Amino acid sequence: MLFKSLLLLSVYAVTCYGQSKVPVYVYYESLCPDSARFINEQLYPVAKELKKNLELHLVPFGKSSYTTQGSDVMFTCHHGENECYGNKVHACAIQHIQGNSYQPNISKEDLTLDYVNCLMHRAQLKDGAFPTKRCADEVKIDQWQAIMDCANSTEGSQLLKQHGDVTNKLQSPLKSVPTVAFKQTYDDELQKLSVSSFRHALCKNLSPQPVECLDLPSTGSAISSLGMIVTVVAVLISRLL
């Protein structure tokens, strides 16, 4: 009975220490090479691995700007008109992607990140039209037509304007793209760390930290506490065997 209790305590300790979640806002542009590199090589793999510890908010606007004339919204984008359209596709995807019965174990958030990752990769190849449908086919989402209709309508403009307002609330204009803000607060040192090693930046902001952060240097007292708990429980269990 004591053995089972100690084993459950060990599992409980590890589980509890892996449940912290931090809001992360990523401000990016649909045709920005630096944004694509960051999302494809850093954000995507880390967010997939640590999704239980990450509340991800994607904000596709970057250094764009907008003006309004009545109900019309006109955008000027860092990489030209095509990027304005691409930003609208991203904004519409974030709004319209839903989970589906064909992928019951994949959430709306998972599908959205998969789709955005594909869009950023494919758009950099510059091999034709913006990859709205191609990525929808690859990721297996059903809402590509709704995304297309949205991007080509006032809905897309309004959604992109909302992302612009979120961006301008952080910085107007952004100092650099992509920008990563934890808890929607800009920190210059965290920004530098995020773009060089997003995993380190995320783990630094998790308290207590999950086991996925154990292999990183300077993991802090939270990891030491977790290691101590698990070690003590392991020793107690070994003495009972």
UniProtKB/Swiss-Prot annotation:
Subcellular location: Membrane
Example of a GO cellular component annotation carried by this entry: membrane
Disruption phenotype: Attempts to generate homozygous knockout mosquitoes were unsuccessful, since gene disruption interferes with both male and female mosquito reproductive biology. Partial knockdown results in severe defects in reproductive system development. Underdeveloped ovaries. No yolk accumulation and oocyte development after blood feeding. Developmental defects in testis. No significant effects on male accessory gland development. Altered expression of genes involved in oogenesis, 20-hydroxyecdysone synthesis and immune responses. Reduced expression of ZPG gene, a regulator of germ cell development. (Microbial infection) RNAi-mediated knockdown causes a slight increase in cell traversal activity of Plasmodium berghei parasites. Partial knockdown results in significant reduction in oocyst numbers at 8 days post-infection with P.berghei parasites. Reduced midgut infection prevalence (the percentage of infected midguts with at least one oocyst) with P.berghei parasites. Reduced salivary gland infection prevalence (the percentage of infected salivary glands with at least one oocyst) with P.berghei parasites. Reduced levels of 20-hydroxyecdysone after infectious blood meal.
Gene3D superfamilies hit by this protein: Glutaredoxin (3.40.30.10)
UniProt xrefs under InterPro entries: Interferon-induced_GILT
Gene Ontology MF term list: oxidoreductase activity; oxidoreductase activity, acting on a sulfur group of donors, disulfide as acceptor
Keywords from the UniProt entry: Glycoprotein, Membrane, Signal, Transmembrane, Transmembrane helix
Topology of the protein relative to the lipid bilayer: Single-pass membrane protein
Transmembrane segments: 218-235
Domain of life: Eukaryota
Keyword set includes Glycoprotein: yes
Pfam family, one: GILT
Signal peptide: 1-18
Note: While mosGILT is an abundant protein in Anopheles gambiae salivary glands, it does not appear to be present at detectable levels as a soluble component of saliva, suggesting that the interaction between mosGILT and Plasmodium parasites potentially begins at some point in the salivary glands and then allows the protein to travel in association with the sporozoites into the mammalian host.
Record's function text: Required for normal development of ovary and testis. (Microbial infection) Interacts with the surface of Plasmodium berghei sporozoites. Reduces P.berghei sporozoite cell traversal activity and transmission. Limits the motility of P.berghei sporozoites. Decreases the levels of host liver infection by P.berghei sporozoites. Does not affect P.berghei sporozoite viability. Indirectly promotes P.berghei survival in mosquitoes by influencing ovarian development and the subsequent production of 20-hydroxyecdysone and vitellogenin, which, in turn, modulates TEP1-dependent parasite killing.
Recorded family membership: Belongs to the GILT family.
PANTHER family reported for this sequence: GAMMA-INTERFERON INDUCIBLE LYSOSOMAL THIOL REDUCTASE GILT, GILT-LIKE PROTEIN 1
Protein name as it appears in the record: Gamma-interferon-inducible lysosomal thiol reductase-like protein
Upper classification of the organism: Eukaryota, Metazoa, Ecdysozoa, Arthropoda, Hexapoda
